[in-house]
Each structure stands twice: as structure tokens, then as C-alpha cells.
Amino acid sequence: MKRKMKLSLIENSVSRKTTFTKRKKGMTKKLTELVTLCGVEACAVVYSPFNSIPEAWPSREGVEDVVSKFMELSVLDRTKKMVDQETFISQRIAKEKEQLQKLRDENHNSQIRELMFGCLKGETNVYNLDGRDLQDLSLYIDKYLNGLTRRIEILIENGESSSSLPLPIVANAAAPVGFDGPMFQYHNQNQQKPVQFQYQALYDFYDQIPKKIHGFNMNMNKDSNQSMVLDLNQNLNDGEDEGIPCMDNNNYHPEIDCLATVTTAPTDVCAPNITNDL
């Protein structure tokens, strides 16, 4: 396994010269790849204690050509990206500090977000927070509300609104079925918004009406029609007194917009299986 080399001056002169030769060869190879792959102009001048004559890459003429083109540039263009080792290290440190601060801000925002939802759920007591946390929480809530407001404005601009959302449905104990009868309106003093209710059909009740009429006419006399009307009204009143149970345990009594009026005559009663003895 290749061990990591310590970045410091090599004390042994023989090892230092060997390392210099290998690294110089690797550097020139990288420069060749850079020029070929990226299409840039590059050169290198190497001074070393192992050779009295400076080494130029790719050649002395090539170095002079690149240097002359560089010197023709303005001072601003020449120094725009020119750094030494100290400046390069300082830039790296500043970049790492900026990244670290960004991560700290993200962690802080996550903590404030959890704190906000904890307060809404009742899991966090705001009286245990210090002044700085309360201030950060207030700022985050304002920012969160502004984001929600902006989202609503965008939806309105796109033609959407809250009225397009389905109304809440109060579920009944039994399975909901259709109802084709008169309209009912329910009033609750604690109810501020209209709620869509589901009604149970009264088909069973209306199915019993012919049976009751048939029973009345089995022993019909002069006051048979009057007895039938009284019995029907009694059944309707019983249904009103029961009310309709809902989820909030309140019995809503219907306010009937229109009721059918039952009008009977002694000689004009029509019902199945009725024998008129008058």
C-alpha cells in the first residue's frame, strides 16, 4: 500500500534529487495534456540546484512567445487571476469559512422550524426560551407567513382560489344515500360557515303511509279521514322531535321550506285496497 508523503523539505539530498526528477517529469506531462486537451498556451521555466542552466518547456522559443503575449495584456488583465501561494491559501480558507457558515445557517433554520411546529403542537413551552430564540422564532414565523401569502397570490393569479376546494363533509353513522325530498336548512349557533351534510332517506317512513291508510279504512266510519290526518301529523311531529344526530352531538332540527298539504274529502279518498263504506 502506497503511504502518503509528508509535505515538507526532504532532508536527504539523494532522495530529494530523485523526487525532483520524478515530479518534474510529471509536471511536464500534465502541461502537455493541458495544452492538448484544453487548447491553451502554457510554458514552464524550472530553476534547480541540480542544473546550472534553467530548463524551459516546451522550448526556449515557446516560452518567449507565451511570455511576450502575456506582457501585451493590460495590468488589470494580467493581475486579475494572478495569485501567489499565500493568496491562494487565504482564498481557500475564506471559501471554507463561507461554506461552514452556510451549513450553520441551515442547521439553525431547521432547529427554528422544529421549534415552531413544536409550539403549534403544544410540545414546546415558549416560556422556556431565551430572548434570542424568541426573536429568531418571530422572524422565522414572519418569513413563513410571507411565503404562504406569496403562494396564495400566485394561485389567485393562475385562476385558482380556495372556493374550488371541496367543502368538508360531516359523516353520518350510517352509509349515506340519496334524498329527493324537500330542502332542509339546519342552524347551529356555533356554526359560522356552511357545512355540507349527508342525509338519510325517509323512504321507510313513507312506505308505511299506505299501510297505515289501509289499516284505517278497515274500520272506517264518518270520522275516518280525520283520524288518518291526525295520525300522519303525529308521525311527522315524532320525526321532528328526534332530530338528526351529527358529529358534534347536536341535534339539528330542520326548518322546512315547503311541506305538502294533505287535503281529504269524505268521498274522495284514494288508496290501495281501500273499501269505502260511506
Curated annotation (Swiss-Prot):
Gene: PHE2
Protein species of origin: Arabidopsis thaliana
Assembly mode: Interacts with AGL61/DIANA and AGL62.
Name by which UniProt lists this protein: MADS-box transcription factor PHERES 2
Other notes: The PHE2 locus is imprinted in gametophytes. Maternal inherited gene is repressed in female gametophyte, while the paternal inherited gene is expressed in the male gametophyte (pollen tube) and in fertilized seeds. The maternal repression is dependent on MEA, which may modulate the methylation of the maternal locus, and repress its transcription. This protein was called 'Pheres' in memory of one of the murdered sons of the mythological 'Medea', as PHERES2 is repressed by MEDEA.
Keyword terms of this UniProt record: DNA-binding, Nucleus, Transcription, Transcription regulation
Function: Probable transcription factor involved in the development of gametophytes and seeds.
Induction (free text): Repressed by MEA in seeds, and by PKL after germination.
Primary location recorded for the protein, binned into one broad class: nucleus
Compartments (UniProt record): Nucleus
Annotated ranges, domain MADS-box: 1-60
Native organism taxonomy: Eukaryota, Viridiplantae, Streptophyta, Embryophyta, Tracheophyta
